[in-house]
Amino acid sequence: NINEVLNAMNGGCSSMSWTTEDNKHLWGRNFDFNCIAEESKIIYIPKGKSYYGCGTRVENNIVEKTKTVSKYAAVGTGIRLMQSTPILYEGVNEKGVMGGQLAYRCFAKYNDKKAKGTIAVQPPFLVTYLLTRCKSVDEVVDMVENKITLMNIPIL
C-alpha cells in the first residue's frame, strides 16, 4: 500500500526544474495528498492587490504589520478560503518566477519568534508572498534569508 510506504518514509511532494535547449525554464511537481480542498481553483492575483502575510480574517487574528501589496501579478493553483490572503499551492509571476508549496512530513521546522527586522509569514502564504514580491531567484533568496520569518502558526 503506497500510503503505508509514504507514512513509513515520511514522504512528501517533489518538484523538478530544467532548462531546455532553447534556454526556456520548466518546472513541475507532484501533489502527494489524497485530496485537495474542494474550493481550490486557478487564482489570479493582480499587481497592486493588498493581503496579509500572517493571520486570517476567518480566525480573526490578522497581524496588521504583515499587510503588503503585490508588486507583481501571479497566477497559479490555490484557494481563497482565508479571504484576507489568497493561498497559492504553486504558480508563476509576471517576471517568470515559479514556485510551489512542497509538503514534506516531519521535516519542516518553523519559528516561534519573529526575527528582528523581518516580516512574519505563515508557511501556507509563502508562495503567494514570494511570487507577488520577487522578480528573480536572487530576490527570493534574499527575502527568505533576510526579510521574512516563517512562523509556526497553523491555519485553522
Regions found by a protein language model. Give the residues of each.
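N-terminal mature-domain region immediately after signal-peptide cleavage
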Residues: 1-139, 149-151
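Internal, well-folded beta-alpha domain core
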Residues: 142-156
